[in-house]
Amino acid sequence: MNEKNSDEINYDFKVDSNLNHTTSHLLAAAIVQLYPNVKLGFGPAIEEGFYYDFEFENPLSKLELLKIEKLMKKLASMNLKMVKVDGSNYDFTNKPYKKELYDELKQKGQEITFYSLVDTNGKEIFTDLCAGGHVESTSKINNFKLLSLAGAYWRGNSNNIQLTRIYGSSFYKKDELENYLKVIEDRKERDHRKIGKNLGIFTFSSLSGLGFPIWLKKGMLIKRAIEKEILYLDRKYGFEEVLSPHFGEESLYIKSGHLAHYQETMFKSLEVENEKLIPRPMTCPHHIIIYDAFPRSYRELPLRLSEQSRLYRYEKSGALTGLERVRTMDLTEGHIFIRQDQIKDEVLNMINLIQETLKIFKIKIDHVALSLRDNDKEKFFDDDQMWDQAESALKEILDQNKIDYIVEKGEAAFYGPKIDFQVKTVLNNIITMSTIQLDFLLPRKFNISYIAPDGSKQTPLMIHRGLIGTYERFVSILLEQTKGNFPFWLSPSQVIVLPIAKEFKEYAFEIYSKIFKQNFNVEIDNRDETINKKIREAQINKYKYQIIIGKQEMENKTIAIREYGKVQTITMDLESFIEKIKSQRDSKE
């Protein structure tokens, strides 16, 4: 479902960090001239530009950015050189944030450097405490834009004062800047929060809790369509669907190790009589309980368990972002219990499942990452033999099946290495879509076993399998990719019937009923409004097909069809139309 970008917008733009870092100095130089009592914070280059933090005497309005830009351009035209200077005489008066950084670097014994913007006469226009990384002259700074204002706590600590952060971006060429500004506007149009609200897909309420999404009718239609495909594929690949409680006793997560490793992202326990119940952040411990509910034989393995699970994870309120970052989420989770000799076959089986799943949703894999541990003994379970065995097994599987991959040290789960399938979204973000995680640890912690052919008790291995991440994040990605214009089979707004006037409503309901009986997402707009208004609203709500019913259609027992995004209508009989949309649904168009 990777919708191609417009020919006019290039999301693969390049941002030069040295150019942007120098532009941040230019911004600070202009600010100091315009607001002499300002206090300077940091001004680094970032992924898509730069920012600089300031403490102003009075609040800064966005309208003032144009005035600041104007002075920046004037300074840039002076061909100021960026020169490393001796900072021994640097005046820290009214510069508490610079002084704090200076003292910190000095205490650590780190190199301290200063850079100045110097005019053609050798006069220092602006000097800053800085580690370097610049272009040699402001003559390179011709195409930049100050983009926005934001609040930012000093050093990222909410206990500190909130400074004013000015964001901007700088490019060498005019067309590069123009393209980037188009990217920003396109991102606004693709904001899943805006689209989701406008199309009635989801909502939030402070009364139901921050970060707890409410799925509306259209959102549930999308979610159920996705879920239907996932459930079918799970059955196809041999999974047994189970359902486990939303809570776990605190001792469960102590035993699993999750409380020790993920306590900051888990909700606090709820004391009920003599129990401490925690909203579950994952289902793997619950699935181990299911495995251990009965004696197991080697003949039963692999045992594949899947669940459409509701999870709860604590996110700070500032990190919550629409459906993308929430505190409760639905996840299609899978856990497979296997024998040692089944590792290769089962991991390959899961690779095939992931590839088939992503193909259905037309999602292209950007790259595969083999995530391994690093030397952090606190971050990862300390058992060298286990790790070496697990990591070499996954590497061998990828190599033998000629699957290209990159190695990412330190990105493994605390209990074992993993294979991550990375996807590039239409907004050029790389995200982990699917994962296969090999786990030698949890089965040991819970002392689960199976009876081997020789009658001995053996410990199974466990594979954690993720297909599409959470439904919340997946739908947010689909909204961004499609701008809400879903492919027909996934659309919550497949067909709407629009009678032109009252006298055609009976025939319109007849059409509606026949389409509804074929299990399509169909609506009827029988309001006493003009047909033009009905069509306009149907287009806004992205109905894939609008069926217009008037005198001619009623007399000829036909329908007039207008497709989303098109002006012309096509007349056909209802049976042919139903066959057409059945074909679209079945072929996943």
Swiss-Prot record:
Q: Which GO terms describe its biological process?
A: threonyl-tRNA aminoacylation
CDD domains tied to this protein: ThrRS_anticodon, ThrRS_core
In residue numbers, the region (Catalytic) covers 191-487
Describe how the cofactor binds.
Binds 1 zinc ion per subunit.
EC number(s) on record? Answer: 6.1.1.3
Which of UniProt's keywords are assigned here?
Aminoacyl-tRNA synthetase, ATP-binding, Cytoplasm, Ligase, Metal-binding, Nucleotide-binding, Protein biosynthesis, RNA-binding, tRNA-binding, Zinc
The UniProt GO MF terms for this protein read:
ATP binding; metal ion binding; threonine-tRNA ligase activity; tRNA binding
Which SMART domains does the record cross-reference, listed alphabetically? tRNA_SAD
Query: Function of this protein?
Result: Catalyzes the attachment of threonine to tRNA(Thr) in a two-step reaction: L-threonine is first activated by ATP to form Thr-AMP and then transferred to the acceptor end of tRNA(Thr). Also edits incorrectly charged L-seryl-tRNA(Thr).
User: Under what name is this protein listed?
Assistant: Threonine--tRNA ligase
Q: Whose protein is this, by species?
A: Mycoplasmopsis pulmonis (strain UAB CTIP)
Q: What gene is this protein translated from?
A: thrS
